[in-house]
Amino acid sequence: MNSSLPTTSFPKNVNEIISETYDIYNSINDDNKTYANCLIMVLKKYHLWPNIKVKKFKNRSDIVLLHNNYKMGELYEYRELYEQCRSIVLDFTLSFNNNVVVTYANSIPVRVDINTYITNIYNDKDKCYEAYDGTMISVYNHNGEWHFGTSSCPDANSSKFSHPTKTHGNMFDEILYKYYGKQLTDHELSLTPNEVSKILRSKFVASLNPEMAYEFIIVHYENIHIIDYTNILGENYKELVHVNTKNRNTFVDEDIYTTRLQDYVEVGINYPKEFTNITDAIGYINSNPYSYGLIIKKKQDNSVKLYKISTEIINYREETDPCHPNTWMNILSVYMKNKQEYTIKDYISNYVPNIVLPIDNNGRYIDPTYLIHTLISTIKDSLYNYYVSTTTYFPKYGRYKMNKD
């Protein structure tokens, strides 16, 4: 008997996913059907979810953000499709093959070490820029409305990580206020935060072309991931870096320096430092403790491939520190990776040596590894008991079925 599992035939590209989404939508006789839910059905059918995810736009079920989880590492079954879904906005009200509002599939860099890049990838026509530690804000116009999102969230106002309450949209507005605040009238300053936000953003997009999509990096003192720029930008720093402009019709990246916006330069919006050769660039990041690394732009036919290079110190930090503001979330993440060469004790020793540990009923400190392991084991036992009590095994079919009674 052949006991091998059947192989899954995955969609070859995004268009095949879109086509099947239309098919499912048209086959459902339900007034409450949505393209977003039909798209999720397609992803689940091929077991692509949650490696590829769907985010809905507020009050719109026909426009979605399709993005991957950026964590798959080596993936062979559907790598090309996975790469296409790095971050792409789809509008299902448009005609087939015309659904892509904007794609950032080639805007998320692939991390490589310095030696690999020099030996296997380098070309003297590559363009090299300084990388910045922050959150990318994507700005584009669709149906006469400007949108501000991140690579995994349609609305920057709903996106947050480093700060418990302040969103990336809030930080973006604070930065815009630094640049445009003096242009506001007393009446405008007296308006609600949401109204002031709209005014600031309208000033910000006044110089932008609706046919283009733009990418900016938020560099904010409350959005620190690896690099704290206080020593070079000052206390409570708030900066915006314009890193890319893309033609939405051809998906071709513009040269960021030949197309830089003078209006932005005049108000203080930054552009990335450009290097004339890779030797100077590597020397710069090795000698500058506040450098996050390099972004390499390599032209490939009609597209641009991005690579990110950092020092070994930065690479080690990103590999070993999840950088979540909640230390215990980081400890849980380290535990889940289950690496023998890097444990919870190593994480605590490196990054939180003064952690305050919980105390048991006898007044003794609870070992963090024991605490997390006990927590996970308890959850596993509970899930197993729930599963056993709510399902029945059918030997004829070799599967479990949920008891709905």
Regions found by a protein language model. Name each.
Residues 2-405:
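Core nucleotide-handling region used for phosphoryl-transfer chemistry
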